[in-house]
Amino acid sequence: MTKVVYPGTFDPITKGHLDILVRAAQVFDQVTLLVLSNLQKKSLFSLEERVRLAKSAIEESNAPSNIIVDSYEGVTVHYLEEHGIRLIIRGLRAVSDYEYEIQLFLANKYLNSQVETVLMPTSLRYQFVSSSLVKEMVSFGLDVSEFVTPTVERALKEKLEVKQ
């Protein structure tokens, strides 16, 4: 069985993330969406909220059943080692993503030479979508229904109203 991990902060999960996730689920036997705690980023949603939103988004998207959601507070490579997984999948939107992903690939290879990274370009309609962009759009009252699922959109509106 070929297992792959799709790691990220997913703050929140977008349809761009779901695009990569669903396409990966068509290629691999099991895909774990790994919601990470990242000390370098100040998250709008807590780790638990991001996991809940990811699960809801996957359900709302009628995604394949070979997708599981997990969370981790640590280095992705350590999670892989703990679960006997060797593959990471990452989405690419632009050339700038590629440069960042190569840095992550090299760091992961340094930590564990057995870990491989698969880079998958995002579908054209989501090339510009990011969690940061979606949060900014919601904060300005703009419609983001093309970029996130209804549950995520509601959660963003609720969370950002509290913050204002």
Curated annotation (Swiss-Prot):
UniProt-listed InterPro entries: Cyt_trans-like, PPAT, Rossmann-like_a/b/a_fold
Biological process, per Gene Ontology: coenzyme A biosynthetic process
Highest taxon of source: Bacteria
Disulfide bridge map: none
Pathway: Cofactor biosynthesis; coenzyme A biosynthesis; CoA from (R)-pantothenate: step 4/5
One Pfam match: CTP_transf_like
Record-annotated site: Transition state stabilizer: 17
Enzyme Commission number(s) from the entry: 2.7.7.3
Keyword set, alphabetical order: ATP-binding, Coenzyme A biosynthesis, Cytoplasm, Magnesium, Nucleotide-binding, Nucleotidyltransferase, Transferase
Amino-acid positions noted as binding substrate in the UniProt annotation, renumbered to this chain: 9, 41, 76, 90
MF terms (GO), sorted A to Z: ATP binding; pantetheine-phosphate adenylyltransferase activity
Known catalytic reactions: (R)-4'-phosphopantetheine + ATP + H(+) = 3'-dephospho-CoA + diphosphate
Residues annotated for ATP binding in this entry: 9-10, 17, 91-93, 101, 126-132
The protein's role, per its UniProt record: Reversibly transfers an adenylyl group from ATP to 4'-phosphopantetheine, yielding dephospho-CoA (dPCoA) and pyrophosphate.
UniProt cross-references to HAMAP family, sorted A to Z: PPAT_bact
Protein name (database record): Phosphopantetheine adenylyltransferase
Phylogenetic placement of the source organism: Bacteria, Pseudomonadati, Coprothermobacterota, Coprothermobacteria, Coprothermobacterales
